[in-house]
Structure formats: structure tokens, C-alpha cells
């Protein structure tokens, strides 16, 4: 007889909290929240806990965009519960720290940044790389800030280290900057017609 497949046991509330505070480094994020106001509509941070989400709501923030994806992990489960309890709208886009995403994901990111209730908070795990890219695109594409200025959102001040593997995002931004300077093409049109994450990743460390 073929044995029935066994289901992985669901994590207990205690296990979820342990994974959240220890494995996901939530305890460290309490000390270094990496929380900044970008403009009247957007704030950035590392992965927020219930207390910081409550503070954000009390400041008028209405929605939260997680760049970690909607996965059944401890930090996502904790965040879902907190946002539901606080009345914050929570949405997800999955970006990666050390590799470039497909163009459809970048367009989805911009769509969420456009349509989510404002003011909004955007975050990843550390608030450095994925969040820095999201803020860069928000400022350049949605607010018309020149790219060279918008890229300041990717800075060591926010714990972004461009010489690390996370610096691969600059290959994409450099390629777009060259095309934009030459032809005047906008970022979204460039993503639809010319962006190739595979080619841009070749030779990356």
C-alpha cells in the first residue's frame, strides 16, 4: 500500500513568536528600526512589529506594503495579525535582496505604490535594499524626482551596501539610466520593452 503523505505540523503560537523574535532578528530591529519619512505619502522602515505599527497608525499611516512576499512565515503571520488588529491595509510584493526580479514584479510594485491608501509604509526585512529600491522607483517614477537624486534612497545611511551582493540592483538602475539619458524612455516603458534581468545578472558576484 502507498503510504498517505503526512502534513508538516503547524507551528504553535510559541514557535511562531520564537522564530519571529530570534530567527528573524525582530529583537535587533527594536533597537534599530530604520524608520524614516520619505514624504507626506510614504514612510520606509525595516520589518515592523505590533508596537511600531501602532505608532505608525497613530501617525496617520493607513496601509503597509511588505516586500517580503505573502509567505506562511513567522514575521508575515505576526504582521498580518497586527495589521488586522490595528485596521491597517496590508499588501505584499515579493522582491529579493541579491537577485533581480522579473519585469512584471517591478510593474506590480509600482502599481501598489500608486494605488495603496496613503500615507503608507513600505518595508522589507532590514529596510535597506528592497525598500531602498522601492523608494527610488516611487520618487523617480511617481514623483518625477531625477534618478540620480532618487537613488539616494539606496545609501549606507539606510544600511544599503552597494559593494555587497545586494548592489546588483544598481546594474538595473545603471542600465535604465543609460537608456533614459539616450532616448528619454520612462522606467515603466523600459521595463516592458528592454529590461532583461538575466543579462544584467551575468557576471555578478
Regions found by a protein language model. Give the residues of each.
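Short cysteine clusters
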Residues: 124
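Substrate/cofactor-recognition hotspot
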Residues: 127
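Conserved SAM/SAH-binding loop-helix junction
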Residues: 130
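Cys-dependent protein tyrosine phosphatase-like superfamily
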Residues: 1-120, 133-205
Amino acid at each position: 500500500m502507498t503510504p498517505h503523505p503526512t502534513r508538516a505540523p503547524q507551528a504553535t503560537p510559541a514557535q511562531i513568536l520564537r522564530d519571529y523574535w530570534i530567527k528573524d532578528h525582530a529583537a535587533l530591529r527594536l533597537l534599530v528600526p530604520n524608520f524614516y519619512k520619505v514624504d507626506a505619502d510614504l514612510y520606509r522602515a525595516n520589518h515592523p512589529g505590533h508596537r511600531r505599527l501602532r505608532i505608525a497608525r497613530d501617525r496617520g499611516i493607513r496601509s503597509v506594503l511588505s516586500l517580503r512576499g505573502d509567505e506562511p512565515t513567522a514575521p508575515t503571520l505576526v504582521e498580518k495579525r497586527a495589521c488586522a488588529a490595528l485596521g491597517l491595509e496590508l499588501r505584499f510584493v515579493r522582491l529579493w535582496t541579491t537577485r533581480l526580479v522579473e519585469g512584471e514584479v517591478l510593474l506590480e510594485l509600482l502599481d501598489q505604490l500608486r494605488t495603496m491608501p496613503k500615507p503608507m509604509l513600505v518595508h522589507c526585512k532590514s529596510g535597506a535594499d528592497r525598500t531602498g529600491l522601492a523608494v527610488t522607483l516611487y520618487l523617480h517614477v511617481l514623483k518625477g524626482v531625477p534618478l540620480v537624486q532618487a537613488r539616494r534612497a539606496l545609501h549606507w545611511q539606510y544600511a544599503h551596501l552597494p559593494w555587497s551582493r545586494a548592489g546588483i540592483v544598481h546594474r538595473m538602475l545603471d542600465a535604465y539610466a543609460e537608456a533614459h539619458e539616450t532616448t528619454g524612455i520612462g522606467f515603466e516603458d523600459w521595463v516592458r520593452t528592454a529590461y532583461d534581468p538575466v543579462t544584467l545578472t551575468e557576471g555578478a558576484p
